[in-house]
Protein backbone atom coordinates (compact mmCIF):
# COMPACT_ATOMS: atom_id res chain seq x y z
CA UNK A 1 0.00 0.00 0.00
CA UNK A 2 1.11 3.55 -0.68
CA UNK A 3 2.11 5.68 2.30
CA UNK A 4 -0.38 8.39 1.36
CA UNK A 5 -3.96 7.64 0.30
CA UNK A 6 -4.92 8.03 -3.35
CA UNK A 7 -8.15 9.68 -2.17
CA UNK A 8 -8.71 11.28 1.22
CA UNK A 9 -11.80 13.09 2.51
CA UNK A 10 -11.38 15.13 5.67
CA UNK A 11 -14.55 16.22 7.51
CA UNK A 12 -16.36 16.72 4.20
CA UNK A 13 -19.89 18.09 4.18
CA UNK A 14 -22.08 19.24 1.29
CA UNK A 15 -25.23 21.27 1.83
CA UNK A 16 -27.22 22.29 -1.24
CA UNK A 17 -28.69 25.77 -1.69
CA UNK A 18 -32.14 24.50 -0.72
CA UNK A 19 -30.79 23.22 2.60
CA UNK A 20 -30.65 19.54 1.63
CA UNK A 21 -27.73 17.75 3.25
CA UNK A 22 -25.83 15.83 0.56
CA UNK A 23 -22.86 14.74 2.68
CA UNK A 24 -22.25 15.04 6.41
CA UNK A 25 -18.87 14.81 8.16
CA UNK A 26 -17.32 12.28 5.76
CA UNK A 27 -13.85 10.98 6.62
CA UNK A 28 -12.42 8.41 4.22
CA UNK A 29 -9.08 7.13 3.00
CA UNK A 30 -8.87 5.08 -0.20
CA UNK A 31 -5.47 3.67 -1.13
CA UNK A 32 -3.87 3.14 -4.52
CA UNK A 33 -5.17 0.07 -6.33
CA UNK A 34 -8.26 -0.50 -4.20
CA UNK A 35 -11.58 -1.60 -5.74
CA UNK A 36 -14.23 0.05 -3.57
CA UNK A 37 -17.99 -0.23 -4.00
CA UNK A 38 -20.34 2.33 -2.47
CA UNK A 39 -23.87 1.17 -1.68
CA UNK A 40 -27.00 2.85 -0.38
CA UNK A 41 -30.50 3.92 -1.32
CA UNK A 42 -31.16 6.39 -4.13
CA UNK A 43 -30.66 9.86 -2.70
CA UNK A 44 -28.36 8.60 0.07
CA UNK A 45 -25.43 10.68 -1.20
CA UNK A 46 -23.51 8.17 -3.35
CA UNK A 47 -23.43 10.32 -6.49
CA UNK A 48 -22.74 13.45 -4.46
CA UNK A 49 -19.74 11.68 -2.94
CA UNK A 50 -18.24 10.74 -6.31
CA UNK A 51 -18.97 14.09 -7.94
CA UNK A 52 -17.40 15.88 -4.99
CA UNK A 53 -14.19 13.86 -5.35
CA UNK A 54 -13.85 15.11 -8.94
CA UNK A 55 -15.15 18.55 -7.92
CA UNK A 56 -18.10 18.41 -10.25
CA UNK A 57 -19.77 19.51 -7.00
CA UNK A 58 -18.05 21.97 -4.67
CA UNK A 59 -18.20 20.87 -1.05
CA UNK A 60 -19.45 23.15 1.73
CA UNK A 61 -16.72 22.35 4.24
CA UNK A 62 -13.74 20.06 4.73
CA UNK A 63 -11.05 19.05 2.26
CA UNK A 64 -10.55 16.41 -0.44
CA UNK A 65 -7.04 15.28 -1.38
CA UNK A 66 -6.11 13.46 -4.59
CA UNK A 67 -2.77 11.67 -4.27
CA UNK A 68 -1.85 14.06 -1.46
CA UNK A 69 -2.93 17.26 -3.26
CA UNK A 70 -6.03 19.26 -2.35
CA UNK A 71 -8.59 19.46 -5.14
CA UNK A 72 -10.94 21.53 -2.96
CA UNK A 73 -9.19 24.83 -3.58
CA UNK A 74 -7.32 23.97 -6.79
CA UNK A 75 -7.75 26.37 -9.70
CA UNK A 76 -6.84 26.65 -13.36
CA UNK A 77 -3.95 24.46 -14.44
CA UNK A 78 -3.69 22.72 -11.06
CA UNK A 79 -7.36 21.71 -11.16
CA UNK A 80 -7.07 20.48 -14.76
CA UNK A 81 -4.03 18.37 -13.87
CA UNK A 82 -5.78 16.79 -10.89
CA UNK A 83 -8.88 16.03 -12.98
CA UNK A 84 -6.68 14.46 -15.65
CA UNK A 85 -5.87 11.78 -13.08
CA UNK A 86 -9.57 11.04 -12.48
CA UNK A 87 -11.66 9.16 -15.03
CA UNK A 88 -15.45 9.32 -14.77
CA UNK A 89 -17.95 6.72 -15.93
CA UNK A 90 -21.64 7.65 -15.80
CA UNK A 91 -24.83 5.61 -15.98
CA UNK A 92 -25.93 7.51 -19.11
CA UNK A 93 -22.55 6.79 -20.82
CA UNK A 94 -21.89 10.50 -21.56
CA UNK A 95 -20.88 9.88 -25.17
CA UNK A 96 -21.16 12.20 -28.17
CA UNK A 97 -23.92 10.20 -29.84
CA UNK A 98 -23.44 11.49 -33.39
CA UNK A 99 -19.66 10.99 -33.35
CA UNK A 100 -17.79 7.82 -34.17
CA UNK A 101 -16.73 5.34 -31.53
CA UNK A 102 -13.08 6.20 -32.29
CA UNK A 103 -13.71 9.93 -31.78
CA UNK A 104 -15.43 9.25 -28.46
CA UNK A 105 -12.49 7.20 -27.22
CA UNK A 106 -10.04 9.89 -28.30
CA UNK A 107 -11.91 12.32 -26.03
CA UNK A 108 -9.99 10.59 -23.24
CA UNK A 109 -6.86 12.39 -24.47
CA UNK A 110 -8.42 15.87 -24.67
CA UNK A 111 -6.72 17.05 -21.47
CA UNK A 112 -3.33 16.41 -23.10
CA UNK A 113 -3.98 18.65 -26.15
CA UNK A 114 -4.57 22.35 -26.80
CA UNK A 115 -8.27 23.08 -27.41
CA UNK A 116 -7.78 24.03 -31.06
CA UNK A 117 -6.26 20.65 -31.89
CA UNK A 118 -9.15 18.68 -30.38
CA UNK A 119 -11.69 20.97 -32.06
CA UNK A 120 -10.28 20.03 -35.46
CA UNK A 121 -9.72 16.38 -34.49
CA UNK A 122 -5.95 16.74 -34.81
CA UNK A 123 -4.95 13.74 -32.72
CA UNK A 124 -1.62 12.01 -33.35
CA UNK A 125 -1.36 8.71 -35.18
CA UNK A 126 0.01 7.22 -31.98
CA UNK A 127 -3.07 8.24 -30.01
CA UNK A 128 -5.39 6.94 -32.72
CA UNK A 129 -3.58 3.60 -32.53
CA UNK A 130 -3.90 3.63 -28.73
CA UNK A 131 -7.62 4.30 -29.08
CA UNK A 132 -7.98 1.30 -31.38
CA UNK A 133 -6.05 -0.84 -28.89
CA UNK A 134 -8.30 0.37 -26.07
CA UNK A 135 -11.33 -0.72 -28.09
CA UNK A 136 -9.69 -4.10 -28.65
CA UNK A 137 -9.39 -4.53 -24.88
CA UNK A 138 -13.17 -4.15 -24.49
CA UNK A 139 -13.90 -6.25 -27.62
CA UNK A 140 -15.22 -3.37 -29.72
CA UNK A 141 -12.51 -3.02 -32.37
CA UNK A 142 -15.07 -3.91 -35.05
CA UNK A 143 -17.15 -0.84 -34.09
CA UNK A 144 -14.35 1.71 -34.42
CA UNK A 145 -16.06 3.73 -37.18
CA UNK A 146 -19.67 3.18 -36.10
CA UNK A 147 -21.64 6.07 -34.65
CA UNK A 148 -22.02 5.86 -30.89
CA UNK A 149 -25.82 6.00 -31.11
CA UNK A 150 -25.82 2.84 -33.27
CA UNK A 151 -24.52 0.76 -30.34
CA UNK A 152 -26.40 -1.04 -27.59
CA UNK A 153 -26.33 0.33 -24.05
CA UNK A 154 -23.74 -2.20 -22.98
CA UNK A 155 -21.53 -1.41 -25.96
CA UNK A 156 -21.80 2.33 -25.25
CA UNK A 157 -20.71 1.79 -21.66
CA UNK A 158 -17.73 -0.23 -22.86
CA UNK A 159 -16.82 2.66 -25.19
CA UNK A 160 -16.88 4.87 -22.08
CA UNK A 161 -14.51 2.41 -20.37
CA UNK A 162 -12.18 2.47 -23.41
CA UNK A 163 -12.25 6.28 -23.20
CA UNK A 164 -11.15 6.10 -19.56
CA UNK A 165 -8.39 3.65 -20.50
CA UNK A 166 -7.25 6.19 -23.11
CA UNK A 167 -7.15 8.89 -20.44
CA UNK A 168 -4.87 6.67 -18.31
CA UNK A 169 -6.01 8.10 -14.97
CA UNK A 170 -4.93 7.04 -11.49
CA UNK A 171 -8.56 6.90 -10.32
CA UNK A 172 -11.83 5.75 -11.88
CA UNK A 173 -15.10 7.01 -10.40
CA UNK A 174 -18.01 4.94 -11.76
CA UNK A 175 -21.42 6.40 -10.93
CA UNK A 176 -24.01 3.62 -11.28
CA UNK A 177 -22.23 2.20 -14.37
CA UNK A 178 -24.69 -0.71 -14.72
CA UNK A 179 -27.96 1.04 -13.82
CA UNK A 180 -29.45 0.88 -17.32
CA UNK A 181 -28.01 -2.50 -18.34
CA UNK A 182 -29.30 -6.07 -18.24
CA UNK A 183 -27.67 -8.50 -15.75
CA UNK A 184 -25.39 -10.23 -18.27
CA UNK A 185 -24.14 -6.95 -19.73
CA UNK A 186 -23.69 -5.54 -16.23
CA UNK A 187 -21.28 -8.36 -15.36
CA UNK A 188 -19.34 -7.70 -18.58
CA UNK A 189 -18.97 -4.00 -17.74
CA UNK A 190 -17.89 -4.79 -14.18
CA UNK A 191 -15.30 -7.24 -15.52
CA UNK A 192 -13.91 -4.44 -17.68
CA UNK A 193 -13.59 -2.23 -14.59
CA UNK A 194 -11.92 -5.12 -12.79
CA UNK A 195 -9.45 -5.38 -15.68
CA UNK A 196 -8.55 -1.68 -15.37
CA UNK A 197 -8.05 -2.16 -11.64
CA UNK A 198 -6.00 -5.36 -11.74
CA UNK A 199 -4.02 -4.93 -14.97
CA UNK A 200 -3.36 -1.19 -14.84
CA UNK A 201 -3.48 -0.56 -11.09
CA UNK A 202 -6.20 2.07 -11.35
CA UNK A 203 -8.05 2.82 -8.12
CA UNK A 204 -11.76 2.16 -8.70
CA UNK A 205 -14.65 3.61 -6.70
CA UNK A 206 -18.04 2.45 -8.01
CA UNK A 207 -21.54 3.31 -6.86
CA UNK A 208 -23.77 0.26 -7.29
CA UNK A 209 -27.46 -0.48 -6.75
CA UNK A 210 -26.96 -4.22 -7.15
CA UNK A 211 -25.86 -5.93 -3.95
CA UNK A 212 -24.96 -9.02 -5.99
CA UNK A 213 -22.54 -7.06 -8.19
CA UNK A 214 -21.13 -5.28 -5.15
CA UNK A 215 -20.41 -8.60 -3.45
CA UNK A 216 -18.97 -10.14 -6.61
CA UNK A 217 -16.56 -7.35 -7.54
CA UNK A 218 -15.91 -5.14 -4.53
CA UNK A 219 -12.93 -5.74 -2.27
CA UNK A 220 -14.12 -3.05 0.14
CA UNK A 221 -17.65 -1.78 0.73
CA UNK A 222 -18.73 1.62 1.98
CA UNK A 223 -22.35 2.09 3.05
CA UNK A 224 -23.93 5.54 2.74
CA UNK A 225 -27.20 6.58 4.37
CA UNK A 226 -28.55 10.14 4.56
CA UNK A 227 -25.18 11.55 3.53
CA UNK A 228 -23.19 9.71 6.19
CA UNK A 229 -20.83 6.74 6.11
CA UNK A 230 -22.59 4.07 8.17
CA UNK A 231 -20.35 1.15 7.20
CA UNK A 232 -16.80 0.69 5.89
CA UNK A 233 -15.17 -2.73 5.74
CA UNK A 234 -13.65 -5.52 3.67
CA UNK A 235 -16.22 -7.27 1.51
CA UNK A 236 -15.05 -10.71 2.63
CA UNK A 237 -15.77 -9.74 6.26
CA UNK A 238 -19.17 -8.17 5.51
CA UNK A 239 -22.24 -10.30 6.35
CA UNK A 240 -25.43 -9.93 4.31
CA UNK A 241 -27.14 -8.39 7.34
CA UNK A 242 -24.99 -5.28 6.88
CA UNK A 243 -26.61 -4.61 3.51
CA UNK A 244 -30.04 -5.00 5.08
CA UNK A 245 -29.08 -2.44 7.72
CA UNK A 246 -27.73 -0.01 5.12
CA UNK A 247 -30.91 -0.16 3.06
CA UNK A 248 -33.44 -0.43 5.88
CA UNK A 249 -31.70 1.25 8.79
CA UNK A 250 -33.88 4.31 9.18
CA UNK A 251 -32.93 7.95 8.81
CA UNK A 252 -29.16 7.64 8.93
CA UNK A 253 -28.55 8.94 12.43
CA UNK A 254 -25.70 6.51 12.98
CA UNK A 255 -22.31 8.14 13.17
CA UNK A 256 -19.76 7.62 10.42
CA UNK A 257 -17.28 4.86 11.08
Curated annotation (Swiss-Prot):
GO terms for cellular component: plasma membrane. It catalyses: phosphonate(out) + ATP + H2O = phosphonate(in) + ADP + phosphate + H(+). SUPFAM superfamilies: P-loop containing nucleoside triphosphate hydrolases. Part of the ABC transporter complex PhnCDE involved in phosphonates import. Responsible for energy coupling to the transport system. It is found in: Cell membrane. Keywords: ATP-binding, Cell membrane, Membrane, Nucleotide-binding, Phosphonate transport, Translocase, Transport. The gene is phnC. Its EC number is 7.3.2.2. GO terms for molecular function: ABC-type phosphonate transporter activity; ATP binding; ATP hydrolysis activity. Residues 7-251 form the ABC transporter domain. This is Phosphonates import ATP-binding protein PhnC. ATP binds at residues 40-47. InterPro entries: AAA+_ATPase, ABC_transporter-like_ATP-bd, ABC_transporter-like_CS, ABC_transpr_PhnC, MetN_ABC_transporter-like, P-loop_NTPase. Transmembrane segments: none annotated. It is a peripheral membrane protein. Belongs to the ABC transporter superfamily. Phosphonates importer (TC 3.A.1.9.1) family. The complex is composed of two ATP-binding proteins (PhnC), two transmembrane proteins (PhnE) and a solute-binding protein (PhnD). CDD domains: ABC_PhnC_transporter.
Amino acid sequence: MADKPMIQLKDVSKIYDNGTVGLKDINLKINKGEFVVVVGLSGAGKSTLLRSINRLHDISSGDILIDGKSITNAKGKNLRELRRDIGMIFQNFNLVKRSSVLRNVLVGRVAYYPTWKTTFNLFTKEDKQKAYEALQKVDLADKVYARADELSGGQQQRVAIARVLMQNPKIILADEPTASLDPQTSVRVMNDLKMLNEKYGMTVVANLHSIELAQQFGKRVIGIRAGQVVYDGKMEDTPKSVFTDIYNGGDGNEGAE
